[in-house]
């Protein structure tokens, strides 16, 4: 019996889900290795969930199933798809659904004796290691090609950001492992890999520092390092002729599923290959080549195009999933024109697509707020299905204030509320200390973030504990956070004893000047003078690594200054910030709309999608990869089911809107 004729054992309730012929073929396929080539809106995650539910109905135990995703959000979307298809909640919880990196970390935890390795995910936490690595190279006396080394100026944040970006790609692609020179790395080797010699030497030095002197576990792990470390271990085993699964590996794996396979890189693929080595493992992967948004980390849709057949004895069956049941023809047409490929629609869906021009940010915000209010009038259920998608985090300030002032509950996805961003928290903290008004900072989480903001921007370090000479700075920092994050009344003492006393003189001078202004008689210009005295861009330039993050932080403060101009004095404005923070905490989350970055909504869908600030240079971002920016726009617009509303700058419209044929 063919896959198309085979009757399914798992039949979701008709009122929940009625699978299409394409979905049924995938659900019931008997192929041990199945690859699904999908299009946006074709219910990739739902279909993969059907595949898992079918295996479960045929006797596969949850403990013998593994679902791997790129992000936590994708994993949560998969759980929701299982539940939406009628899989009992208890069964949904039993399935192991996790990210590649979390899976790798769990395996490594067993290998490393149960000792957790600290994570350092922020670029700012990795900067000092990069400079230590530069120093190591500089100190090396036996360097054979010193003229090939290009040393940066000390403190060059752009150099650090560029190296971190290069490192993410080099690790994701396993370039040094796959093209390892027989002897010592040479400039010619680097040229053959398409890299600068300095970059590769720096990566080697950085990795030695990360490994530390312990034979069993590294000092820390950065973004995706767990996957990278496990992949290297597996490659070494293969090279040594060892075919033994590491401790912590799934003992019996019957069903293996990979969602968003188009974002797979070489390190993830190496882990996948080892998982595919088990006998009797049924594998299904699904992806869409037009939704690759992690190419900077080595993501490549090519892993769905022959690599498995080339590297294993498996002969994958390839099935299509092209008909979109998320949106109608009015959205399918521009989306199809944008990617230059046909998009099929089914189910008689109707999707409204509108393009509205705006002259400035305030006007755009007003238009978005009006659309949100109109959506809320349709009921709480409709409001909960409404999403505002932003290209940049800093674009949320005016929208957040409008939502909060309008009593409209929202949940943030892929971004922090502007009130909790470090540069804004530092401003709030200084004003709170001067005014002795700690009402809005009383929450432990907020206090913790506030202390971390001072530490980030002021370079605060803690005195070594003579009773614990082995305690590293991370441990001392953790202890201090517990002490100072318990009570807002401790903030003045923290500022005096740990920030001002140990700060760089230039930083301390700016902090004291700002506090002096904050203590003067109030008036309409005091907040502006406070910001000028503080000179927050100076702190941002010293502390933050990535250019886009620095630019975003400055934009956050510009937005804060613009917001303050609507209030008669600093006291009133600070009161507004405090009231906003309190109201935000107290908002009921039922019927909340979603405020998200476009990059955070892959795998999700919404009844209505609003995309503001579509201005050339903003989206597409002028510093972004053209391909990644285009894929990100495609991902964002195809999240909509019933309505897509685009707000386009009237003088500098996004080229993407025109490319989709909507201008």
Question: Which ranges hold each PLM region?
Answer:
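P-loop NTPase Walker
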Residues: 1-116, 333-336, 638
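Accessory N-terminal region flanking or inserted into the helicase ATPase core
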Residues: 2-47, 64-66, 146-257, 266-271, ...
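Conserved RecA-like helicase ATPase core segment
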Residues: 10, 266-354
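Helicase P-loop NTPase motor core
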Residues: 34-35, 40-52, 56, 313-410
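Hydrophobic residues in beta-strands of the RecA-like P-loop NTPase core, especially within AAA+ ATPase
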Residues: 258-264, 287, 611
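ATPase/helicase motor core of nucleic-acid motors
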Residues: 310, 380-529
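C-terminal accessory regions
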Residues: 403, 571-573, 577, 613-663
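A short beta-strand element within the Helicase C-terminal
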Residues: 594-622
